[in-house]
């Protein structure tokens, strides 16, 4: 009860400065050759988007460190600690869920039947909307799972979940204030694990990862050498959506799937 009551007011800042921040400082020194935050486009416009609370959508390179380094950079420069999503398939140990929830994570439930998946997606979408109405910043990867082959393409299912109960699709997307971010690691410590997974899937299409495999990837991704790391922020896609709708009003008449594909392309172009 104490943790719940003071989660955002007292306990969380202590976690940031007394535990999480020093750990990331050590990891930056031991596992990287430096981390940069860069801007693509109008920096003032990007910072304005950030101040109003942004939905940071990135390509996906590492299970843990993608969100961790973004939090480190945003906390250091803008004193922002984003909420972030993590799949329940990664809870290989009982304590992981409790730790990530304490660090402002929300759980993306990926198992269950069709009806369960729809209900879970609706609940998650409503929770994200609740955070955005409070101008909280959020991180979510553009796809389920890391891009093993480096082909960074936004999965339509992510946008379907985010707008699952929307009447006006484009307005619903604009309310999220999606700011695409590109992540680049000079070295991928999990490259051999990703190659192994692709090979096993090619040899046996029915092969599936175990929770132990995910834990190994998490450990290697945290401790492995990454070289230089660059996070590049881009402006909110809202500006381009407004321009596109003004020039092509017929976009509003497209099917929902076509509208989703249009926004996916915008995000991909930014990343």
Feature roles, as predicted:
Residues 117-271:
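Non-catalytic C-terminal accessory region of glycerolipid acyltransferases
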Residues 1-54, 60-71, 75, 97, ...:
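Membrane-anchoring hydrophobic helices of lipid-metabolizing enzymes
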Residues 61-63, 88-92, 111-115, 143-147, ...:
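Short acidic/polar capping segments at secondary-structure boundaries
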Residues 49-52, 101-107, 135-143, 230:
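Glycine-rich, often proline-containing surface loops adjacent to acidic residues and nearby aromatics
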Residues 74-82:
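A short alpha->loop->secondary-structure connector
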Residues 64-67, 72, 93-96, 149-150, ...:
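Short helix/loop capping segments that flank catalytic or ligand/cofactor-binding pockets
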Residues 83-111, 117-118:
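Conserved nucleotide-cofactor-binding alpha/beta core module
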